[in-house]
Amino acid sequence: MSQLTYLFRSAPHGSAAGREGVDALLAASAYCEDITVIFIGDGVYQLLLGQEPSGILSKDYAPMLKLFDLYDIEQVFVCSESLAQRGLAQADLVIDAQALSLEQVKEKLQQAGKLLSF
């Protein structure tokens, strides 16, 4: 069972939810070693390479995603169906994330101790 599961399901830059979620995730990693991160639905866009949010006066927080390794956040997953529905592939992502089927994502969510959704 994962003690903390962070579920990213909203698109980036339309609101501060994604950035705040990444901030919370990195902060929590100092206190908790058992963290799972899942990107599903429009949340997969947060992992997309080549974003230029400065055009809409938004902060680019994609470099913060690359800190996951440094913070020992190793359980990072992306829903393969969400990628396919949006015409994306894992090569389009800014970080390596293990692809899971929707059914496998549901299993991970059922195993979550605490779930934080952004």
Curated annotation (Swiss-Prot):
Keywords: Cytoplasm. Gene3D superfamilies: DsrEFH-like (3.40.1260.10). Disulfide bonds: none annotated. It is found in: Cytoplasm. GO terms for cellular component: cytoplasm. Belongs to the DsrF/TusC family. Could be part of a sulfur-relay system. This is Protein TusC homolog.
